[in-house]
């Protein structure tokens, strides 16, 4: 038998004979992996101060991105020297191109808003954060994967098929001061009328027992985030995505206030922005960017993020705050809930956050 000394020498010789590349791999395995620093989300007591999100900066954020596809649309017609589209392109192909272009722009706006909200959340925290974090994505999350494409695609197709007129170029509207004045009017009328239809059906889902099954999935989330904005049963998705916009469009038409394609497109972007912001749970005081927001605040019927957040935390029959754009109908029908964190005592009037000043990461991050 070889001695212990000989065995040790052989072991040392065998180690020395290992190629340097293998040694490096072994050394790399022993090294502790580098971990990225985790940014802690601030947890704020419910009685601590809360900042305001500037209203004009939200209009700037939405309008600039809403006008982007309209501008590209107009430039395309100028480059191709097309005065009347029907003479050059088949109407079906033309509408298909419009759907693709505006659909991509819709998705771009929502993703940028989502990134801005995520950035704000890391700095300011979330509502009810001292009690419970935001709910995580459930295991059965397949609906979340196609909820955004479904919303974007359905509303864009609806808008193009119902209101798009190929014979009218965007410049025919954008160059008119009257059109801009009416746009400001529609940015008040459209969300208020839409909110009436949503309030009625939403309240019925809660108070009529046989209708609750169409709304149950959306309420499995008690502390929502932007991912759960369109997380719902198929019946609710159909009503939210195309039902209320169509009812509002034809109501305005019946009132002799018809909307052109570009006005409706911009109004839809405003509605989608408010829907996402309302499910964000951000610990910030802000109202939906409605052109008459100052008037709603004067009468105490403005909506804030906490209103819908409290609605999700309440039970099946105990829920209140059914509105999603304003508090007009909740106030009229006595279904308002008291605010906890965004009460006037906590609001910091001197501390404002601007949407355009948020350092939004690139879409690839």
Curated annotation (Swiss-Prot):
Pathway note: Secondary metabolite biosynthesis
InterPro entries: Fatty_acid_hydroxylase (IPR006694), Sterol_Desaturase_Related (IPR050307)
Native source species: Lecanicillium sp
Region (Disordered): 20-41
Subcellular localization(s) per the UniProt record: Membrane
Pfam entry (one): FA_hydroxylase
Top-level taxon of origin: Eukaryota
Consequences of knocking out this gene: Leads to complete loss of verlamelin production.
EC number: 1.-.-.-
Entry keyword annotation includes Protease: no
Family: Belongs to the sterol desaturase family. TMEM195 subfamily.
Described purpose of this protein according to its UniProt entry: Fatty acid hydroxylase; part of the gene cluster that mediates the biosynthesis of verlamelin, a lipopeptide that exhibits antifungal activity against plant pathogenic fungi. Verlamelin is a cyclic hexadepsipeptide and is bridged by ester bonding between a 5-hydroxytetradecanoic acid moiety and a carboxyl group on the terminal Val of amide-bonded tetradecanoyl-hexapeptide D-allo-Thr-D-Ala-L-Pro-L-Gln-D-Tyr-L-Val. VlmA and vlmB are altogether regarded as essential components in the biosynthesis of 5-hydroxytetradecanoic acid.
GO BP annotation list: lipid biosynthetic process
Residues listed as glycosylation sites in the UniProt record: 47
Enzyme class name: oxidoreductase
GO molecular function terms listed in the Swiss-Prot or TrEMBL record: iron ion binding; oxidoreductase activity
Bilayer disposition of the protein: Multi-pass membrane protein
Segments passing through the bilayer: 62-82, 89-109, 144-164, 179-199
GO CC terms: membrane
Keywords of the record: Glycoprotein, Membrane, Oxidoreductase, Transmembrane, Transmembrane helix, Virulence
Record flagged with keyword Transmembrane: yes
Residues covered by the Fatty acid hydroxylase domain: 189-335
This protein's name: Fatty acid hydroxylase vlmA
């Amino acid at each position: 038998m070889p001695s212990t000394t000989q065995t040790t020498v052989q072991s040392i010789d065998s180690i020395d004979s290992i190629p340097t590349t293998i040694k490096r791999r072994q050394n790399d395995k022993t090294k502790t992996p580098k971990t990225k620093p985790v940014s802690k989300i601030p947890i704020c007591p419910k009685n601590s101060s809360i900042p305001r999100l500037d209203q004009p900066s939200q209009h700037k954020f939405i309008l600039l991105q809403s006008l982007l596809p309209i501008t590209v649309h107009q430039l395309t017609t100028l480059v191709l020297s097309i005065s009347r589209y029907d003479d050059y392109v088949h109407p079906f192909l033309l509408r298909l191109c419009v759907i693709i272009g505006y659909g991509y722009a819709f998705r771009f706006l929502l993703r940028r808003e989502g990134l801005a909200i995520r950035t704000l959340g890391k700095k300011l925290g979330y509502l009810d954060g001292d009690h419970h974090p935001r709910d995580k994505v459930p295991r059965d999350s397949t609906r979340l994967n196609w909820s955004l494409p479904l919303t974007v695609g359905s509303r864009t197709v609806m808008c193009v098929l119902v209101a798009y007129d190929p014979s009218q170029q965007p410049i025919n509207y954008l160059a008119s001061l009257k059109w801009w004045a009416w746009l400001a009017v529609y940015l008040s009328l459209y969300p208020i009328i839409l909110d009436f239809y949503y309030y009625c059906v939403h309240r019925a889902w809660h108070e009529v027992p046989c209708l609750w099954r169409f709304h149950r999935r959306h309420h499995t989330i008690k502390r929502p985030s932007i991912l759960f904005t369109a997380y719902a049963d198929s019946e609710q998705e159909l009503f939210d995505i195309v039902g209320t916009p169509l009812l509002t469009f034809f109501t305005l038409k019946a009132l002799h206030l018809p909307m052109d394609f570009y006005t409706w497109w911009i109004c839809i972007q405003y509605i989608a922005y408010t829907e996402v912001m309302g499910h964000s749970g951000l610990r910030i005081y802000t109202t939906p960017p409605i052109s008459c927001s100052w008037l709603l605040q004067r009468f105490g019927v403005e909506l804030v993020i906490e209103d819908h957040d409290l609605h999700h935390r309440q039970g099946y029959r105990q829920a209140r705050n059914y509105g999603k754009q304003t508090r007009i109908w909740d106030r009229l029908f006595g279904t308002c809930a008291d605010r906890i964190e965004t009460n006037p005592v906590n609001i910091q009037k001197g501390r404002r956050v601007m949407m355009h000043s948020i350092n939004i990461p690139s879409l690839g991050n």
